[in-house]
C-alpha cells in the first residue's frame, strides 16, 4: 500500500518548469546566482529594475515550490541550507534566513525555533511543555513552506487587509523607535521594540500608532531576540517597495563614515525607575511612554506602610524615643525596661539572665534619678539568689605552723584503748576550751594561747589577742582564719578585699566550678569603705574576667558599677562603647537597635540627676539610629532625634566634632519638612529652618573658620607666606631704613613663631627685625657645607657706645638659623640676641642680654670650651660671668644649648653640649678680661677646632656703620677710632656666595685656600684641613683631649 501523500487543500499542484532542480528537505530550492561572493554580503542580481522579469521570477518560484515528492514528509530547513536556496532577487540584512516569499505564518500548528535563550512561538494554543524547542521533531506537525495556498492568501491580504493600507504609517512609526535608532543596531545587537504582525488576528488590529511597539511585542508574547527573528519570517510584502527595502538595507562601507556616533543607551529594556524620598517615601515611575498615548504615572508609596511588618520597625516604634528630659515621663521608660526584662527571662537563652539584669538595673536607676547606692544594687543582685549556696570548705592545705598537710592537732587526755593502744580524743566543751585559753595566759604563754584558740576555732579570742601583738602575728592569725573558708565563699572575697588586695573572685569568677558571680559583686558593693580606688579596681577586674568568658552583659554591669567612661568602637582597649554590646565584633552586630536603646536610657537616667550630662561618644550612635528611623519611614521621629543630638552638641562648648556636626546638618536638612511647624511657617520657596538647626550651622561655620584660619606650620616655606605678609610698625624705623630691610615683618613673626616661645623671658617688649628677602631666597633647604664663608648680613648699631654687631654666616644653610631677635629697653640702649630654634631642630647660639653689646662666643670657641670641660671636669670658673643677671641668663642659655646639643649632622664633632660663654655686663667690648684676650693675642692667625676652619676676616662696613670684625680665632684685625664691633661666627647661615667677604681672605699668610663650591652636598670632615690650637693658647693648661683627637700637623 502506498504511503499517503499530503496534498494541498483546494489547490492543484502545477508541474515544475525546471526539472533540473533538486529537492532538499521536502521542497525545491532556487538556484544560486553564479556571481556569489562571501566577503561581506551575498551579492545577487538586482531584480527590481525590471518589473516584468521580477514577475516571471515570481511565477517560476511559485511553480517550483508547488512540486513535492510522493512519500516524503516535508521538514523545515536549517538556516544554512536556507541561505543556499534563497531567492537571488532580494537583499537580506541578516544571513541565514530564507526567501521572503516563504515568511508567512500558517494557521496550522508549527514548531518553536530556538534562538539563543528565546523561542519563536508557534501556535498559541499549545502548552509550553508541548512546544519542543527543536527543529524537525518527528512528533510535531509542520506545514509545507512551498504550499501555493499561502501565496494566494498573500495576494488577498495585499488587496483586502488593513496592514497593506497602513504600511506607510507603520514604517514611519517604527523608524522613530529609539531602540532601533540606537548604535546597538549597527553592531548587530538585538533590539527590542520592533514589531511586525504575527498572525491573522493581529493583522486585523487597528493602527499601530494607537499602541506602542513595546506593548504590541508584550501582547504577542515575543522577547527581544525572538521578535527580531520573526521579522524575517513574517509576511511583509511592502518590503519589496524601494522605500521599504532601503530602510532595511545593510549599512554599506560608504555609509559607515557618514553615521554620527551615538552614546549607547544605558538600558535597552524598559524598567521601573525607583527612588527613595527624604520623608520616608518610595517613588516609582512605570515605563509608560506619553508619546504613545500612555499616561505618565508617578507612584508614591510610604515606607512606613511597606515595612510595617518588619521586626526592626516594630522595635523602633515601641521605643519612646528620643529621651529628652522635658518631653517624656520616666514612668514610660520604666515600663518599657520592665517589659524588656520580662521578655529576656522568658527566652531562657544563655545570656538572657544577665541581659534581664541590665534592664532591671536601668529600671532602678530611673527610679532613683540616676543615683547608684551600693546596698540597692546588692539587693538587685541577690533577687535571684534567694537560696544561698552552701560553700564547701576547701581540703586542708599546708599548716601555717608546721607546714604539713595535717589538720590542726587536738590535745586529748584520757585512758588508752586496750585494743588499739591509742588514746581516744577527749571532746572538750566550749567552757573547757576557754578555760584552758585563760590558764595559758595566766602564765604568759601568748603564743601557745593563740595556737590553742586557732585549733579550737576561737577566732575572736585569737584575733583580738593578735591585734594587740605585733603586725606579723596578726597577719598570721588572719591568714589562718581565712584559710578555713571556702575559696568561692563571698566572705573570703570580702576579707581579702579588706586586707588590701584584689580578691581571688575578681580573677576567676564566671566558671561553673566557682559559682555565681553576683554574690561576690554584691558583697563588694555593699561594704565599700577605705580605699575607693582598690574597690574600683576589683570591680573592673571582675568585669574584665567576665568579658573574657564571653559574658558581655555581666561585664558591662560591673563596668557601670565602677563608673567606667564610655569609649569608642575603633579603640578596642576601651571597656564599653554601648551597653550590653561588645565592640570586638563587627559593626553591624555591635550597633544593634537594642544596644542603642539601652545606652540612651542610661544616658537619660544620668540626666535625671545631672542635667546636660550627655555621653559625648554616644551621639554618633544616636545619629545612626535616626538614620535607621528615616529608612523605615519614621521621618518625624528621626527629626526629633536630630534635634536631641543638636542640643547635646551645642551644650558641649569645649569639645568639637566637625564630622558629626556636618552629617547631622545633612540629615536634618532632608527631614526638616517633616516637622509640621516648619511646614506651616514655610513661605513660598523660602524655608524657615528651626532655631536649633540655625545654631548648628553657625557652630559648624565657626569650626570651619577656625580650621582654615589656624596658624601656619613653622616648617612651611617662605614662598608660601610671602603672599600673606603685611606691614607693621617697628620701634626702629631708622634702623630698618638704614639697613635697607624689607618691611614684611609679618613674615618674620610668622616664620619664627616657635622661636618666640623658646626665647629668653624678657619683661620688655619684644620686636623682631625683618630680614632682607632677596638675601636668602634662592637657598632654601641646601645642606650646610663644612667650609664657612663669612658674609655680613646684619649690623645693629648702638647709639650710646657706637658699637655695632656684625653677624657672619656660612652659605647653604637654611633661612632662619642665624636669625637674631633684639629686645630693646625703653630708656636705655640694650640689645639682646636670643637663640632661635630652626624647624629642623638646629639652634643658633647667641649672646645674652647685657647693657652693652657683649661678645658672643662662636662655635669655634664653644668647641674649645667643650674640650676644656672634658679635661678640667666641672671647673669652669674662668668662663663664668660675674654679673648676677648674666649668670642667670647664662643658666638659661645652657639649658637651650643642652636642648640642641647635637647641632645636627656634626653632633659627633662635639664631646658634650657647650655652655654659653659670656662676659660681664659691666665690661665693654674694648675692655675684655685677660683670660679671654691673652690667647687670642698670642695666636692671631690660628683657628680653634670648630665648625668654621677659616681665618679671621674683615667684614666690610655697611653704610653709616663703622665696624671692626673679630674672627673665630679671636684676634682683632681692623678697627676704627670711634666704634667697635663684634663679628660672630655663627656656623649656620642662610646666605650664599661670597657676599661681604673681605679681600684679606686670600692674602693672609695663615689662611687656607678657598674651598670649592659645593652645591647640595656635605663634604666629610678631614681633621688635617683644620688648623689646631697651640698649647700656649689654653691659659697655660694643655688641652690634651683636643691634641689627642686632632693632633697638630707638623710645620
UniProtKB/Swiss-Prot annotation:
Which residues carry the post-translational modification Phosphoserine, per the record? Answer: 70, 137, 182, 185, 245, 860, 863, 866, 874-875
Free-text tissue specificity from the UniProt record: Liver.
Q: Where is the composition biased (Gly residues)?
A: 984-993
- Provide the alphabetized UniProt keywords: Endoplasmic reticulum, ER-Golgi transport, Golgi apparatus, Membrane, Peroxisome biogenesis, Phosphoprotein, Protein transport, Transport
Where is it located? Endoplasmic reticulum membrane; Golgi apparatus membrane
Cellular-component GO terms for this entry:
endoplasmic reticulum exit site; endoplasmic reticulum membrane; Golgi membrane
Record field: compositional bias (Low complexity):
798-809, 900-920, 936-947
Q: Report the residues modified as Phosphothreonine.
A: 850
Basic and acidic residues bias spans: 39-63, 703-715, 877-897
Annotated InterPro entries: Sec16_CCD (IPR024340), Sec16_Sec23-bd (IPR024298)
A Pfam family assignment: Sec16
Q: Which residues form the signal peptide?
A: none
- Biased composition (Polar residues) is annotated at 1-23, 64-77, 163-177, 737-754, 1022-1037
Its record classes its membrane topology as: Peripheral membrane protein
Spell out the Acidic residues composition-biased ranges: 921-932
Q: State the source organism's domain of life.
A: Eukaryota
Q: Where is this region: Disordered?
A: 1-109, 157-203, 703-754, 798-820, 850-1051
Listed under subunit, the entry gives: SEC16A and SEC16B are each present in multiple copies in a heteromeric complex. Interacts with TFG. Interacts with SEC13.
Role, per record = Plays a role in the organization of the endoplasmic reticulum exit sites (ERES), also known as transitional endoplasmic reticulum (tER). Required for secretory cargo traffic from the endoplasmic reticulum to the Golgi apparatus. Involved in peroxisome biogenesis. Regulates the transport of peroxisomal biogenesis factors PEX3 and PEX16 from the ER to peroxisomes.
Protein name per its UniProtKB record = Protein transport protein Sec16B
Q: Which organism is it from?
A: Mus musculus (Mouse)
Amino acid at each position: 500500500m502506498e504511503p499517503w501523500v499530503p496534498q494541498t487543500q483546494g489547490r492543484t499542484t502545477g508541474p515544475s518548469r525546471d526539472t533540473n532542480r533538486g529537492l532538499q528537505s521536502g521542497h525545491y530550492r532556487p538556484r544560486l546566482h553564479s556571481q556569489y561572493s562571501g566577503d561581506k554580503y551575498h551579492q545577487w542580481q538586482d531584480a527590481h529594475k525590471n518589473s516584468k522579469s521580477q514577475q516571471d521570477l515570481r511565477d517560476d518560484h511559485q511553480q517550483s515550490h508547488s512540486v513535492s515528492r510522493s512519500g516524503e514528509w516535508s521538514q523545515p530547513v536549517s538556516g544554512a541550507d536556507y541561505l543556499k536556496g534563497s531567492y537571488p532577487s532580494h537583499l537580506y540584512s541578516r544571513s541565514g534566513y530564507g526567501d521572503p516569499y516563504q515568511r508567512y505564518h500558517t494557521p496550522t500548528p508549527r514548531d518553536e525555533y530556538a534562538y539563543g535563550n528565546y523561542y519563536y512561538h508557534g501556535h498559541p494554543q499549545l502548552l509550553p511543555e508541548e512546544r519542543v524547542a527543536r527543529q524537525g521533531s518527528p512528533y510535531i506537525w509542520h506545514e509545507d513552506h512551498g504550499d501555493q495556498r499561502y501565496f494566494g492568501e498573500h495576494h488577498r491580504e495585499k488587496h483586502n487587509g488593513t496592514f497593506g493600507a497602513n504600511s506607510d504609517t507603520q514604517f514611519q512609526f517604527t523608524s522613530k523607535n529609539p531602540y532601533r535608532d540606537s548604535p546597538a543596531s549597527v553592531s548587530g545587537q538585538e533590539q527590542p521594540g520592533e514589531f511586525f504582525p504575527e498572525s491573522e488576528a493581529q493583522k486585523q488590529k487597528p493602527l499601530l500608532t494607537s499602541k506602542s511597539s513595546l506593548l504590541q511585542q508584550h501582547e504577542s508574547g515575543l522577547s527581544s531576540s525572538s521578535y527580531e527573528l520573526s521579522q524575517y519570517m513574517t509576511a511583509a510584502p511592502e518590503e519589496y517597495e524601494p522605500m521599504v527595502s532601503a530602510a532595511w538595507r545593510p549599512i554599506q562601507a560608504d555609509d559607515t563614515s557618514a553615521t554620527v556616533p551615538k552614546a549607547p543607551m544605558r538600558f535597552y529594556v524598559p524598567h521601573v525607575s525607583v527612588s527613595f524620598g527624604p520623608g520616608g517615601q518610595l517613588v516609582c515611575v512605570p515605563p509608560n511612554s506619553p508619546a504613545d498615548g500612555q499616561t505618565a504615572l508617578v507612584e508614591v508609596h510610604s515606607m512606613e506602610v511597606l515595612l510595617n511588618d518588619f521586626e526592626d520597625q516594630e522595635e523602633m516604634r515601641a521605643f519612646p524615643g528620643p529621651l529628652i528630659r522635658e518631653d517624656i515621663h520616666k514612668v514610660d521608660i520604666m515600663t518599657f525596661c520592665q517589659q524588656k526584662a520580662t521578655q529576656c527571662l522568658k527566652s531562657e537563652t544563655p545570656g538572657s539572665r544577665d541581659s534581664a539584669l541590665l534592664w532591671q538595673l536601668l529600671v532602678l536607676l530611673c527610679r532613683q534619678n540616676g543615683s547608684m547606692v551600693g546596698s540597692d544594687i546588692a539587693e538587685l543582685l541577690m533577687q535571684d539568689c534567694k537560696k544561698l549556696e552552701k560553700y564547701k570548705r576547701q581540703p586542708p592545705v599546708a599548716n601555717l605552723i608546721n607546714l604539713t598537710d595535717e589538720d590542726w592537732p587536738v590535745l586529748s587526755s584520757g585512758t588508752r584503748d586496750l585494743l588499739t593502744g591509742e588514746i581516744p580524743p577527749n571532746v572538750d566543751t566550749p567552757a573547757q576550751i576557754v578555760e584552758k585559753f585563760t590558764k595559758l595566759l595566766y602564765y604568759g604563754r601568748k603564743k601557745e594561747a593563740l595556737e590553742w584558740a586557732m585549733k579550737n576555732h576561737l577566732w575572736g579570742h585569737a584575733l583580738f589577742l593578735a591585734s594587740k601583738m605585733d603586725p606579723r602575728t596578726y597577719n598570721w592569725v588572719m591568714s589562718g582564719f581565712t584559710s578555713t573558708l571556702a575559696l568561692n565563699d563571698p566572705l573570703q572575697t570580702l576579707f581579702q578585699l579588706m586586707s588590701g588586695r584584689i580578691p581571688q573572685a575578681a580573677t576567676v569568677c564566671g566558671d561553673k566550678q566557682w559559682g555565681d558571680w553576683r554574690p561576690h559583686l554584691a558583697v563588694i558593693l555593699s561594704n565599700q569603705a577605705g580605699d575607693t580606688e582598690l574597690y574600683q579596681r576589683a570591680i573592673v577586674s571582675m568585669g574584665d574576667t567576665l568579658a573574657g568568658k564571653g559574658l558581655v552583659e555581666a561585664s558591662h554591669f560591673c563596668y557601670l558599677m565602677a563608673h567606667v567612661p564610655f569609649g569608642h568602637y575603633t579603640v578596642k582597649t576601651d571597656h564599653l562603647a554601648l551597653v550590653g554590646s561588645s565592640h570586638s565584633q563587627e559593626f553591624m552586630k555591635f550597633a544593634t537597635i537594642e544596644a542603642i536603646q539601652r545606652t540612651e536610657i542610661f544616658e537619660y537616667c544620668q540626666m535625671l540627676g545631672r542635667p546636660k550630662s550627655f555621653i559625648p561618644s554616644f551621639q554618633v550612635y544616636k545619629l545612626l539610629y535616626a538614620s535607621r528611623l528615616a529608612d523605615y519611614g519614621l521621618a518625624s521621629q528621626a527629626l526629633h532625634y536630630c534635634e536631641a543630638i543638636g542640643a547635646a552638641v551645642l551644650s558641649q562648648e569645649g569639645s568639637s566634632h566637625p564630622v558629626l556636626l556636618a552629617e547631622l546638618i545633612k540629615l536634618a536638612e532632608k527631614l526638616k519638612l517633616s516637622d509640621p511647624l516648619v511646614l506651616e511657617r514655610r513661605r513660598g520657596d523660602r524655608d524657615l529652618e528651626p532655631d536649633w538647626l540655625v545654631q548648628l550651622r553657625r557652630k559648624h561655620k565657626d569650626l570651619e573658620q577656625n580650621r582654615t584660619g589656624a596658624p601656619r606650620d613653622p616648617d612651611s616655606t617662605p614662598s608660601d607666606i610671602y603672599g600673606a605678609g603685611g606691614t607693621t610698625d617697628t620701634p626702629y624705623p631708622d634702623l630698618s631704613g638704614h639697613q635697607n630691610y624689607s618691611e614684611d615683618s609679618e613674615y618674620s613673626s610668622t616664620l619664627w613663631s616657635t622661636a618666640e616661645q623658646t626665647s629668653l623671658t624678657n619683661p620688655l617688649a619684644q620686636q623682631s627685625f625683618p630680614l632682607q628677602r632677596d638675601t636668602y631666597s634662592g637657598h632654601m633647604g641646601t645642606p650646610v657645607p663644612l667650609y664657612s664663608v663669612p658674609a655680613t648680613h646684619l649690623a645693629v648699631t648702638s647709639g650710646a657706645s657706637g658699637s655695632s654687631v656684625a653677624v657672619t654666616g656660612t652659605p647653604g644653610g637654611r633661612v632662619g638659623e642665624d636669625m637674631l631677635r633684639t629686645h630693646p629697653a625703653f630708656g636705655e640702649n640694650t640689645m639682646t640676641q636670643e637663640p632661635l630654634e630652626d624647624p629642623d631642630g638646629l639652634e643658633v647660639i647667641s649672646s645674652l642680654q647685657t647693657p652693652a653689646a657683649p661678645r658672643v662666643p662662636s662655635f669655634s670657641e664653644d668647641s674649645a670650651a667643650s674640650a676644656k670641660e672634658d679635661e678640667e671636669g666641672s671647673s669652669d670658673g674662668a668662663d663664668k660671668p660675674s654679673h648676677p643677671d648674666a649668670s642667670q641668663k647664662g643658666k638659661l642659655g645652657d639649658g637651650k644649648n643642652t636642648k640642641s646639643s647635637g647641632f645636627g649632622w656634626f653632633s659627633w664633632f662635639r664631646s658634650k653640649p657647650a655652655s654659653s660663654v659670656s662676659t660681664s655686663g659691666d665690661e665693654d667690648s674694648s675692655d675684655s678680661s685677660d683670660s679671654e684676650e691673652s690667647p687670642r693675642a698670642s695666636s692671631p692667625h690660628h683657628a680653634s677646632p670648630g665648625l668654621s676652619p677659616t681665618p679671621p676676616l674683615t667684614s666690610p662696613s655697611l653704610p653709616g656703620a663703622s665696624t671692626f670684625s673679630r674672627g673665630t680665632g679671636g684676634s682683632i684685625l681692623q678697627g676704627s677710632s670711634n666704634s667697635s664691633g663684634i663679628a660672630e661666627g655663627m656656623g649656620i647661615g642662610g646666605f650664599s656666595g661670597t657676599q661681604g667677604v673681605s679681600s684679606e681672605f686670600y692674602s693672609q699668610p695663615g689662611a687656607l685656600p678657598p674651598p670649592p663650591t659645593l652645591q647640595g652636598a656635605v663634604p666629610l670632615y678631614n681633621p688635617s684641613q683644620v688648623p689646631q690650637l697651640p698649647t700656649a693658647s689654653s691659659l697655660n693648661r694643655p688641652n690634651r683631649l683636643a691634641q689627642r683627637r686632632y693632633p697638630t700637623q707638623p710645620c
